[in-house]
Amino acid sequence: MPRSLKKGPFVDDHLQAKVDVQNEKGTKQVIKTWSRRSTITPDFIGHTFAVHDGRKHVPVFVSENMVGHKLGEFAPTRTFKSHVKEDRKSKRR
C-alpha cells in the first residue's frame, strides 16, 4: 500500500538540510548518505548522492525521471556473479 498523499513524501531531515544548504550556496558537492529510504523530491534534481549499498557508497546522479522513487532503488545491494559455463579443457581426459 502506498504512502498517504496527505502525509507527503518521506525524506530524512538531515538529508533535506544538506540539500537545502547546497541549494542556497549554489554548490553541487557529492552528498554521502546511508538513507536509502528517503524519497527523491524535485529539489534533489541535479545533485549527486553517494548512497550506501551495505559495502560501499554508490554515486547516484538525480534526474527528473527519478522524482518519486527512493534513493535505495538506484544502488543495488546484491552483486550477481554470472553462472560460469563449464570449462571444456578441464572436462577432457
From Swiss-Prot:
Superkingdom of source: Bacteria
Any one Gene Ontology molecular-function term assigned to this protein's record: rRNA binding
Keyword Cell cycle: no
GO annotations of cellular component type: cytoplasm; small ribosomal subunit
InterPro entries: Ribosomal_uS19, Ribosomal_uS19_bac-type, Ribosomal_uS19_CS, Ribosomal_uS19_SF
Gene3D superfamilies found in the cross-reference section: 30s Ribosomal Protein S19, Chain A
GO-annotated biological processes: ribosomal small subunit assembly; translation
SUPFAM superfamilies xrefs: Ribosomal protein S19
Keyword annotations from UniProtKB, A to Z: Ribonucleoprotein, Ribosomal protein, RNA-binding, rRNA-binding
Transmembrane helix recorded as keyword: no
Family: Belongs to the universal ribosomal protein uS19 family.
PANTHER family with a match to the protein in the record: RIBOSOMAL PROTEIN S19P FAMILY MEMBER (PTHR11880), SMALL RIBOSOMAL SUBUNIT PROTEIN US19M (PTHR11880:SF8)
General function of this protein: Protein S19 forms a complex with S13 that binds strongly to the 16S ribosomal RNA.
NCBIfam families in UniProt: rpsS_bact (TIGR01050)
Name of the protein in question: Small ribosomal subunit protein uS19
Organism of origin: Nocardia farcinica (strain IFM 10152)
